[in-house]
Amino acid sequence: MASVLEKVLRVGEGRTLRKLQNYAKAVNQLEEDFTHLTDEELKNETVELRERHANGESLDDLLPEAFAAVREASRRTLGLRHFDVQIMGGAALHLGNIAEMKTGEGKTLVATLPAYLNAIASRGVHVITVNDYLASYQSELMGRVFRALGMTTGVILAGQTPQQRREQYAADITYGTNNEFGFDYLRDNMAWQASDMVQRGHFFAVVDEVDSILIDEARTPLIISGPSAGDANRWFTEFANVAKRLVPEVDYEVDEKKRTVGVLETGIEKVEDHLGIDNLYESANTPLISFLNNSIKAKALFKKDKDYVVMNGEVLIVDEHTGRILMGRRYNEGIHQAIEAKEGVAVKAENQTLATVTLQNYFRLYKKLSGMTGTAETEAAEFMSTYKLGVVPIPTNRPMQRKDQSDLIYKNEKAKFEQVVEDIAERHAAGQPVLVGTTSVEKSEYLSKLLAKKGVRHEVLNAKNHAREAAIVAQAGHLGSVTVATNMAGRGTDIMLGGNAEFLAVAAMNARGLSPVETPEQYETEWDDVFAQVKAEVDEEAAKVIEAGGLYVLGTERHESRRIDNQLRGRSGRQGDPGESRFYLSLTDDLMRLFNNGAAASLMGRDSVPDDVAIESKVVSRAIRSAQGQVEARNAEIRKNVLKYDDVLNRQREAIYGDRRHILEGDDLQERSQRFLEAVIDDVLDSHIGEGNGDDWDFDALWTELKTLYPISITIDEVITEAGSKGRVNRDFVRREILSDAKLAYSKREEQLGEAAMRELERRVVLSVIDRRWREHLYEMDYLKDGIGLRAMAQRDPLVEYQREGFALFQQMMGAIREETVGFLFNLEVEVQAPADAESVGPRIQAKGLAANQATADKLRYTAPTDDGGVEVRNQRGQIEKAATAKAQKDQQAEDAVLVGEDEPETPQGPPARGAFGQPTGASSAPQNREERRKADRRK
């Protein structure tokens, strides 16, 4: 199906390119006019364009003039003029497409075109990059273009305070990473004051390296979490010791391809003997099964120095695609704790999910979305089906001259690396720069030792020295340089022959203590001279590099994804430069070993083929392409499945977040509370009386429950007397009497506290209850999804079952929210205090057991996806924000809060009575909790 869709998508490419070429022609016709404008006149173009847009002209109509203005501003500030193909790429982005542009075609510069045009609407434009460094670098460099046009730029970085973030989002164009934008969206929907929210909507986004962000990282959601009750850490340590004693193929079996393990009967017996239990699979022991499976996975599937490294007593994940250490990232589902126990380091506690969204659903919030990458063609069908984004291949500015050599395959890894070293040494001696791509930290260090032994000077870029990453990449095009890198996906820094002049110039300016933000005038004054000097030196060296053959890219192993291989190759041959690429493979490489059908091994097994002799075979090439296709199809199916299930939760999230936003924006909480009161009384009546009359009802039980809900003032006898007799009391009559009494009690409560204090109490209670119940609902939905796959064994569609039961859980949650809200509003002990000062808005109230504001910031954890199945976890302080800063932020929140709360747990503690607010309020007592549903599942 995908192949048919891809063919259909390609049919309209010619028509689209002609449309883009017409835009480029229109911009070219205006170029001369704009060159004659003064700097002030150029800046005033923005004012004029905004006025025209406000008067009804569409952004499409303004495109030629806006693009011409950006081209001229870039020429004046950066000395870079947009090529026609870059104009075409910018137009493709503005029209809501993915522009497929080869490496080195200037994607960063292209993004300025649609960013400026859409910023004319004054609704904010987001430019999404792959890391904080690039966000800061691009906002600094491209900010010079936007400032020349009278527009402001911002950058969102980890560690910024809410006030700093709000200021950055207020800019016309804001740069940042997908994780930061996504977390701000979640935090905004956890805010307790409208003034605490930082984003101002989702109008238009340009996503750089769009395939990496929207495809590779789409499987795992963004999660904000906080500490959870209980401590299971001792079990991780216990089972790590158990796993050490289990023997592969005797006690358990492993499927490396599917990344699964299975415990055999002998293994189960050993575990039961070790723990002193009779049956591991008894209901009381079922929680232990996940500890066992995770411990075996940690032992068998996760390898030290390949999948992770241990540094300073911590287990740090290594990104399989980029080779970077993913600081703070953690595998989910208990895998990371199992690895920590395996390595004998401190096991960190698990957290409870407070808010979550997948990147797929976050980016679908934008009114218009676009993206750039050099390798989107292989995923065109998925981009269209998931994001409604077309892929438009943009022609290169100059013809590609890179020579892509055929793969060389060796019998074993030792022979392969020996030939790799020989090839590198020869090219290094000739002055040709070499970029070597490896698939793991272990392989890069192994190759580094071989090169050192050979006497070849080189730089190593991997997870253990990523702090120098950008500087190393920028120098990788120098004469005779050799750079060993653990995969090059998402590096984001151009490798230019002779060196990256822009990067080197910015570094030189920073060395002088100059910043475009802090010293803008001096920065602009000195930039031209510094850049000209650096550019001259780079150009002179580039000529020598071209003579030596350009950049040579050498891959030491094929990756599971063709896109990653293409990204590595694409580092060479930018902008028509000469270059060359080749992959060296062996039959023991992971991809060949896991997916090889045996044809290659049969071919290489002949005695006539020595170890140090390579073969070039179409059979092997086909086997590799087939293996990569299998992996890509499997990953695409996983992403598709994740989206289907998350769409269920997404609709619920939109309802809850919409409710919260209305509350923060001044929704009539008195009217909402009255609706809640009516609904709760209806629920109580439904549970105690039927359709008959008073002769059949248990009035005592009904009144007992009503007393726990609100201070009921009417008696049973009064209701019966009013009706005339017990038999004449029907449901409508008793409902009317009770509701009238409840509303009277509510009015008395408001009179007692005062109108302003009552409104504030309503806001506090509703937000607190919604947030807590939503957290518990996320917990329940997560558990439901974990086991829903088993329904297939009963010939039921797991997705349909998940939708049905998820809706039922949502309805239960909404009922619990109404019930708890009413109970708290009537029963909380509230002390009303006078305003702190003349500037305070309304009275201050103190409600015992009710949170003063949202979850304590310094206890939150931020979890982000990685394309290898791991997750990134940062605390509020992180590596960038210091503890003092986090404390200052927390103090500021407490100071700014309208309410003052006691230093108690944020979970509201309700009156000791009935229902959701009277019983223990943890997940263990929530309707359809885990243990109850386990029993229900076993019955099914």
Swiss-Prot record:
Matches recorded under SUPFAM superfamilies: Helical scaffold and wing domains of SecA, P-loop containing nucleoside triphosphate hydrolases, Pre-protein crosslinking domain of SecA
Record's compositionally biased regions (Basic and acidic residues): 929-940
Binding site for ATP: 86, 104-108, 494
Alphabetical UniProt keywords: ATP-binding, Cell membrane, Cytoplasm, Membrane, Nucleotide-binding, Protein transport, Translocase, Translocation, Transport
Magnesium as UniProt keyword: no
Region ranges (Disordered): 884-940
Subcellular location: Cell membrane; Cytoplasm
EC number per UniProt: 7.4.2.8
InterPro entries: Helicase_ATP-bd, Helicase_C-like, P-loop_NTPase, SecA, SecA_CS, SecA_DEAD, SecA_motor_DEAD, SecA_preprotein_X-link_dom
Pfam families the record matches: P-loop_SecA, SecA_DEAD, SecA_PP_bind, SecA_SW
Record PROSITE patterns: SECA (PS01312), SECA_MOTOR_DEAD (PS51196)
Molecular functions per Gene Ontology: ATP binding; protein-exporting ATPase activity
Enzyme class: translocase
Catalytic reactions of this protein: ATP + H2O + cellular proteinSide 1 = ADP + phosphate + cellular proteinSide 2
Membrane topology note: Peripheral membrane protein
Biological processes per GO annotation: intracellular protein transmembrane transport; protein import; protein targeting; protein transport by the Sec complex
Lineage top rank: taxon: Bacteria
Subunit organization: Monomer and homodimer. Part of the essential Sec protein translocation apparatus which comprises SecA, SecYEG and auxiliary proteins SecDF. Other proteins may also be involved.
HAMAP family with a match to the protein in the record: SecA
PANTHER family, per the entry: CHLOROPLAST PROTEIN-TRANSPORTING ATPASE, SECA INNER MEMBRANE COMPONENT OF SEC PROTEIN SECRETION SYSTEM
Function: Part of the Sec protein translocase complex. Interacts with the SecYEG preprotein conducting channel. Has a central role in coupling the hydrolysis of ATP to the transfer of proteins into and across the cell membrane, serving as an ATP-driven molecular motor driving the stepwise translocation of polypeptide chains across the membrane.
Family according to the record: Belongs to the SecA family.
Name of protein: Protein translocase subunit SecA
Lineage: Bacteria, Bacillati, Actinomycetota, Actinomycetes, Micrococcales
